[in-house]
Amino acid sequence: MRKGLASRVSHLKPSPTLTITAKAKELRAKGVDVIGFGAGEPDFDTPDFIKEACIRALREGKTKYAPSAGIPELREAIAEKLLKENKVEYKPSEIVVSAGAKMVLFLIFMAILDEGDEVLLPSPYWVTYPEQIRFFGGVPVEVPLKKEKGFQLSLEDVKEKVTERTKAIVINSPNNPTGAVYEEEELKKIAEFCVERGIFIISDECYEYFVYGDAKFVSPASFSDEVKNITFTVNAFSKSYSMTGWRIGYVACPEEYAKVIASLNSQSVSNVTTFAQYGALEALKNPKSKDFVNEMRNAFERRRDTAVEELSKIPGMDVVKPEGAFYIFPDFSAYAEKLGGDVKLSEFLLEKAKVAVVPGSAFGAPGFLRLSYALSEERLVEGIRRIKKALEEI
């Protein structure tokens, strides 16, 4: 009898962003004043009106199993939101609610990937994508994006990496970790190319509300029915309404795919916590949500400007101004090389400056560091000041 764990988990790595955040929390518990730039979550609390809707649902006894794809009211509200805001028409039967966008992506990759199928990943990329793809026997294929071009994705970039085994491309705009918002015209060209080649588009739109300046967010599925038919539109309540711990995300896609994803959901998650779904429903239906989102977006835009200004004071620092999300992704290569890489640099900054950052190699970009500016302006300035001071000793 063979013993031991399955080979599929032998190379599985824990999330580096969660690991960094855990280390920072551990130090804080010991009384150390650590400034955390690692967290991928807003520092705002979930609005009270959303919490109250959840409490109300609890008191009304909404504590039993729910339909695996999500309560009907929530799926209907998501369909209304997608039509009104994203200009894409979906039926509730084409929507599946699961335990956060991360679980939604897990189910999508489970549904579409066979051994050896390739998935294009514009790089830098969110740390979870390649791990999930490999877990299901897929091959992540990096599409390197240039800092000098603002980490924008072009059709030519995509064409260079497409092969007969290409099954899908992940589009994450606004982007984590770079903050890039992909240009609409280029996205259209890429989408049309994917239609021609029969390549799925997995559109991760979790940061759609956090777009700054002249940048414009667009859902690829809105381009045409042909594009919609090959697209998995993924979103969540985590960032938009500061509900990261609630774990509620969803996918909208053609019904034949939605049925498969719902079946997989039923055999894994069963259903998202029933009473929590009523909080998500309130987030979509309550007019106060718009004011809350605007408040967060305005705060993040101010902090982005502050982060760019403060980081630019560090000698040799090259900073691309983010157009969206709430991350900044500066090139620290000049300093990382002196210490043996960006992982060593992040360890040095945690030890010396008591600042937690995420090494760029986790995102496929060695030499860079990701800093979240989802923290108070005062702590933001103090944290970058500490980084600057520590780097002077290298």
Curated annotation (Swiss-Prot):
Q: Where is this site: Important for prephenate aminotransferase activity?
A: K13
InterPro entries recorded: Aminotransferase_I/II_large (IPR004839), AspAT/PAT-like (IPR050596), PyrdxlP-dep_Trfase (IPR015424), PyrdxlP-dep_Trfase_major (IPR015421), PyrdxlP-dep_Trfase_small (IPR015422)
Q: Which GO terms describe its cellular component?
A: cytoplasm
N6-(pyridoxal phosphate)lysine found at: K239
Localization (cell): Cytoplasm
> Which catalytic reaction applies to this protein?
L-aspartate + 2-oxoglutarate = oxaloacetate + L-glutamate; L-arogenate + oxaloacetate = prephenate + L-aspartate
Q: What is its EC number?
A: 2.6.1.1, 2.6.1.78
> GO molecular function of the protein, one example?
transaminase activity
Keyword entries, A-Z: Aminotransferase, Cytoplasm, Pyridoxal phosphate, Transferase
Subunit field text: Homodimer.
Described purpose of this protein according to its UniProt entry: Catalyzes the reversible conversion of aspartate and 2-oxoglutarate to glutamate and oxaloacetate. Can also transaminate prephenate in the presence of aspartate.
Q: Which family does it belong to?
A: Belongs to the class-I pyridoxal-phosphate-dependent aminotransferase family.
**Protein name as annotated:** Probable aspartate/prephenate aminotransferase
